[in-house]
Amino acid sequence: MCIRDSSIEEGVTTIDSNLLFSGNVKKINIPKSVTKIDAAAFMYCYDLQSINVDSENDRYMSEKGILYNKAMTRILCYPAGIKDTEFFVPDTVTTIDDLAFYGTKALESVNIPDSVTNIGTDAFGECSGLKEVVIPDSVTSMGEAVFYKCTSLEKVKLSVNITMPNPAVFQYCSNLKEVVLSENMRFLGDFMFSYCTQLTNIVLPDTLTSVLRSAFQNCDNLKNITVPKNVTTIQDYAFGYYYDEQSATYKKYDDFTISGYAGSKAQEYAEANGIRFIELNKKETTDGIKIEYSKDDSSIGGDNEEKISLESRQLTESDEEYSKIDFTGKIEDSDVKPEDVKSVTYEISLKNESGQTVQPSEKVTVKIPVPDGYMGENCKVYYVNEKGKFTNMNAVCQNGFLIFETAHFSTYLVTETNIKTVSEITYGDANGDGKIDSRDAVVIKKYVAGFTGFTIDLEASDVNADGKVDTRDAVKILKKIAGFDVTLGET
C-alpha cells in the first residue's frame, strides 16, 4: 500500500518498511493506535517535513515535527525534508536510533549532547549537507555506516569511549579531510574510511591493535600512514589499495608508503604487499617531548644521526627568549586578558656533538605532553618566531600528547587560549625586513651552512614549498630578483 496523503487511519498499530509512503509526502499524522514504527518506515520520504503524533499515543510523541519515543529518550526520525541547517538534539535523548537522520539534505550541523550514549546504524546515512560533527565522550557505541555517504562531511571528532567501531562508519565520505580518533581506540572496522578520497592525513592512536579489511581502501589522496607499534593485526587491503571496478580487482597505489618500527606488523604487511616501508626512529627529552622521523633519510644529522640529541627546556619570564612573547592585541578570546593567558613555553632544539644547534632537513613529527591541568582537546600549539609572531601548528591531541609536524625547532607555546596568528607569509622575505632582495638569499645560505646568531623566517624562506630550506630556495629568490618568471611559495 502506498500512502500519498498525510494521515494514517485510526486503528493501524504498525508502521513498517512495507507500508510505503509516497516520496513527495510532506506531512504525516500518526494516530494513538500505533504501537510500533519500523526504523526504515520513512527512509525514502525525502520531502517529509513534519511527523505529528496524537497526544494520546502511549508509545510515541512528536515535537516540532520530529518523532521521539514517549519518554523522549530516543530520537526516531528527523524528517529529511526539514530545511533547517542546524539541529540541537534535546538533552533528554540517550539514543539516536537507526536511520534517524537518514537522507537529510539541508542539515549542516548536529549538536549532540552529553546525554547521548548510543548512535544507531546509518543514523546519519546520506546526510549530504552535513559538514562537521563532534561525537561527545558520553557515546560508548555506534552502529554500522553511521555517516555513510555524508559527502559534505569535512571534520569529525570521535568520543574517547569509542574503542571498537563497527564497519563502514565513514564509508564514501568523499570530502572528509580531518579526523580525530578516540585516544582509546583498539580497532578500525572494515571499510571504516574507504572511499574517503580527500583524506590526506590521519593520526592513528598508540592504543590501536587491529586495522580490519579495507579500512582505508580507495583513499586516493592518502599517500602515507604511520602505524603504531602496538598494532598486531592488519587485514587484507587495509592500506594502500583501491578497488578497480573495470577489472573488478584490487590494485595497489604506486606512491603509497607505510611508516613504522622495525620488526612491527606494519613492516610485515608492507613487505608482504610490496609497499614501500619507512622505518622510524625517535628521540625524547627529559620533559617527555618526543620526535619521530624516518631512519631512511638524512633529516636528522645524516650519517651522524646517532650523535644528534634532542633537548628542551621550559621557559620562564626570566629567560631572554621569553621576552618576545607578548599577547597584547593577539588574543581572539574576548574574555581573556593578556596577563591572564595560561600557557607553557618550551625551547626545543637539536644539538650536534659539539653542542651547536642544528635543524632537520625534512619535516619530523613532534609530540609534546599535555601539561598538567590542561584539557588536551582544547590545547593549541603555536610556534613563536623571532619577532613574536604566532603560527598555529594545528596540533592534534592523541594519547596525552599534542602532535604536529615541523622542520624547525625553536620556541613553542602550549595554551588553551585562541591567539591571532600570522595571516600572510611574504615568501622570499627570509630576514623579515619587509622586502625581497639578495640579502634574503644570503641569509638562507648562512642558515644552510650552519651559521647562527641571525634572524631567519623559515616559513618565508621555503619559497619552493617543499617543506625544507636549502640552497634551492636561495637560487629561486635570486631568479625572482633577476626577473625570471617564477612564483615564490609554490613548487
Protein language model features and the residues they cover:
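Surface-exposed loop/edge segments in extracytoplasmic proteins
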Residues: 388-394
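Consensus positions within tandem repeat domains that build extended binding/scaffold surfaces
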Residues: 17-19, 39-41, 76, 98-100, ...
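Feature for mature exported/ectodomain regions
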Residues: 281-379, 385, 415-423
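Structural signature of tandem-repeat unit edges
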Residues: 4-14, 22-36, 45-95, 104-118, ...
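Cellulosome-associated attachment modules in secreted, modular CAZymes
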Residues: 417-491
